[in-house]
């Protein structure tokens, strides 16, 4: 049976521009680069105001309120020339192509994709999100070692963990699903993390749809926590106590990763 994505709600996307600006500042403070700079470094690509057609999709649970408008705001923020089609689904796709879209953005319950019609490149949100959040974590300027804790090894976390392994980090991984943990251990050679014998980390990447997955025992002072997970992986109390550098935003960072990956 196909696994659905964790779905955003309209409340997650309120004030998306403000959320994105805040995240951009946080990323720059942690890495020395803004989100666009991270994307350029990660993919070696540059934006030239490509025209992006955003197509609403009604299948499954239907259109998420604010989703298309949020994608429009996000793509504009990163310098793309975007528009939302009047029609959804196949009619919307046709409309986008007829109106000169070079890149299509569209999502149903299982897949959020970017498709560059000029070069044929296609990107899925889940791996792109995992990779960019892992990349941000890996660039933490104040990291005290190459040890990284990855919590969540599913469709977002596994690609992020793989990216960190490829960058020669020593990756400790944990997932409540033992099958996912065993797969990551076997395929990536990561070190299984045992919550009963914790250690502290200055770099943490989290990718789960669960709240408060990061226990106090793994937090070091001023560590970075890079997480696309909703709800937030850490309590406000622990974040304040350890002055955690939190990188968390619902949609924009992953979308930027998708777009730059298909340029």
UniProtKB/Swiss-Prot annotation:
L-pyrrolysine binds at residues 8, 57, 64, 107. It catalyses: (3R)-3-methyl-D-ornithyl-N(6)-L-lysine + NAD(+) = L-pyrrolysine + NH4(+) + NADH + 2 H(+). GO terms for biological process: amino acid biosynthetic process. Disulfide bonds: none annotated. NAD(+) binds at residues 155-156, 175, 210, 228, 230, 249. Keywords: Amino-acid biosynthesis, NAD, Oxidoreductase. GO terms for molecular function: oxidoreductase activity. It comes from the Archaea. Its EC number is 1.4.1.-. Pathway: Amino-acid biosynthesis; L-pyrrolysine biosynthesis. NCBIfam families: pyrrolys_PylD. Belongs to the PylD family. Catalyzes the ultimate step of the pyrrolysine biosynthesis pathway by converting the isopeptide (3R)-3-methyl-D-ornithyl-N(6)-L-lysine to the 22nd proteinogenic amino acid. Is able to use surrogate substrates such as (3R)-D-ornithyl-N(6)-L-lysine in vitro. This is Pyrrolysine synthase. It comes from Methanosarcina barkeri (strain Fusaro / DSM 804). The gene is pylD.
């Amino acid at each position: 049976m196909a696994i659905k994505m964790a779905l955003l709600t309209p409340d997650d996307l309120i004030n998306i521009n403000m959320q994105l600006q805040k995240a951009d500042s946080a990323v720059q403070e942690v890495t020395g680069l803004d989100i666009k700079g991270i994307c350029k470094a990660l993919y070696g690509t540059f934006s030239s105001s490509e025209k992006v057609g955003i197509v609403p999709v009604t299948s499954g649970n239907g259109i998420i309120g604010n989703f298309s408008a949020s994608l429009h705001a996000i793509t504009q923020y990163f310098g793309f020339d975007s528009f939302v089609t009047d029609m959804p689904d196949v009619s919307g796709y046709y409309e986008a192509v007829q109106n000169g879209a070079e890149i299509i953005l569209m999502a149903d319950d299982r897949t959020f994709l970017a498709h560059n019609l000029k070069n044929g490149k296609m990107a899925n949100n889940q791996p792109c999100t995992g990779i960019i959040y892992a990349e941000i974590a890996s660039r933490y300027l104040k990291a005290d070692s190459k040890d990284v804790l990855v919590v969540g090894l599913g469709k977002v976390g596994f690609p992020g963990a793989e990216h960190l392994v490829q960058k020669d980090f020593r990756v400790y991984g944990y997932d409540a699903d033992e099958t996912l943990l065993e797969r990551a251990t076997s395929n990536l050679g990561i070190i299984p993390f045992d919550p009963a014998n914790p250690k502290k980390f200055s770099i943490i990447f989290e990718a789960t749809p669960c709240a408060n997955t990061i226990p106090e025992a793994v937090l070091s002072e001023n560590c970075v926590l890079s997480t696309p997970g909703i709800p937030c992986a850490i309590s406000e109390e622990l974040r304040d106590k350890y002055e955690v550098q939190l990188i968390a935003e619902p949609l924009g960072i992953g979308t930027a990763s998708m777009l730059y990956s298909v340029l």
